From Swiss-Prot:
CDD domains: 7tmA_OR1_7-like
Superkingdom in the source lineage: Eukaryota
Keywords in alphabetical order: Cell membrane, Disulfide bond, G-protein coupled receptor, Glycoprotein, Membrane, Olfaction, Receptor, Sensory transduction, Transducer, Transmembrane, Transmembrane helix
Identification of the protein by name: Olfactory receptor 1496
A Pfam match: 7tm_4
PROSITE patterns xref list: G_PROTEIN_RECEP_F1_1, G_PROTEIN_RECEP_F1_2
Ranges annotated as spanning the membrane: 24-48, 56-77, 99-118, 138-156, 195-217, 235-258, 271-290
Role according to the record: Odorant receptor.
Residues carrying sugar: 3
Molecular function, one GO term: G protein-coupled receptor activity
Source species: Rattus norvegicus (Rat)
One CC-aspect GO term: plasma membrane
Length: 310
């Protein structure tokens, strides 16, 4: 038998930042995190307050903003805390909780991007039937179903990880408890964990990405049948924001998991993890607000109504 130690805590390696630059990066990450919180909260509030945004697209967008807000909050507070103190430990239960919520909100973003792509497909290819196909009841049920799927999927992987045994090495080579890193630390058999990750990754990453590509292929095909400058402009104005977010989200995932790793794979994994846990959630509100007339008009209406009330 191997000598096994009951692990009560893990040590997060953190980001490879020189000591003299810690304060600078702490301030940078704090500003990025606060920007993420405020930007996504603004979208959620606007969608709730402005009746003209009570549409399927903005239902999905508000849930995406909530998911982004929580996704960043899973890792950033602990990272900021560790940068201000010498104690980088995280309790065993806290590590599993971080892994669970990281998967919940990461999966939810992937699902919501598919739902938003389908919404754009119906709006452009079947405009006369849009309200009947994308009914409020259907969209609400779809969002609830997606939350149930993501929480169940995350719970399955978390429970499988909880059954693993860990030996003396408890240093997590990342700034948060990533499931892949935890499996490398386990000294018990991880075959079931790896098998389920492979199966579920196919279902939750590859298939959603394929569905998004298919939706936009149908949109492009529909536009090409009746080519016009107005039609092309409509597609870009309607889908540009969503395509930008899809590119950011899946671009980082492809860069992290599909590109070959070099000698500095740990640093690369941390950088890519920062991209999709911090940078992408921060940029999403700017992408949707700067390229979306409805959001700009809604913001003006809400501000004007507040002035009238005051």
């Amino acid at each position: 038998m191997n000598n096994q130690t009951f692990i009560t805590q893990f040590l997060l390696l953190g980001l490879p930042i020189p000591e003299e630059h810690q304060h600078l990066f702490y301030a940078l990450f704090l500003v990025m995190y606060l920007t993420t919180i405020l930007g996504n909260l603004l979208i959620i509030v606007l969608v709730q307050l402005d009746s003209q945004l009570h549409t399927p697209m903005y239902l999905f967008l508000s849930n995406l903003s909530f998911s982004d807000l929580c996704f960043s909050s899973v890792t950033m507070p602990k990272l900021l805390q560790n940068m201000r103190s010498q104690d980088t430990s995280i309790p065993y239960g806290g590590c599993l909780a971080q892994t669970y919520f990281f998967m919940v909100f990461g999966d939810m973003e992937s699902f919501l991007l598919v739902a938003m792509a389908y919404d754009r497909y119906v709006a452009i290819c079947f405009p006369l039937h849009y309200t009947s196909i994308m009914s409020p009841k259907l969209c609400t049920c779809l969002v609830l179903l997606l939350w149930m799927l993501t929480t169940s999927h995350a719970m399955m992987h978390t429970l499988l990880a909880a059954r693993l045994s860990f030996c003396e090495n408890n240093v997590v080579l990342n700034f948060f408890c990533d499931l892949f890193v935890l499996l490398k630390l386990a000294c018990s058999d991880t075959y079931i964990n790896e098998l389920m990750i492979f199966i579920m990754s196919t279902l939750l990453i590859i298939i959603p990405f394929f569905l998004i590509v298919m939706s936009y292929a149908r949109i492009i095909s529909s536009i090409l049948k009746v080519p016009s400058t107005q039609g092309i402009c409509k597609v870009f104005s309607t889908c540009g924001s969503h395509l930008s977010v899809v590119s950011l989200f899946y671009g980082t995932i492809i860069g992290l998991y599909l590109c070959p790793a070099g000698n500095n794979s740990t640093v690369k994994e941390m950088v890519m993890a920062m991209m999709y846990t911090v940078v992408t959630p921060m940029l999403n509100p700017f992408i949707y607000s700067l390229r979306n007339r409805d959001m700009k008009r809604a913001l003006i209406r809400v501000i004007c109504s507040m002035k009238i009330t005051l």
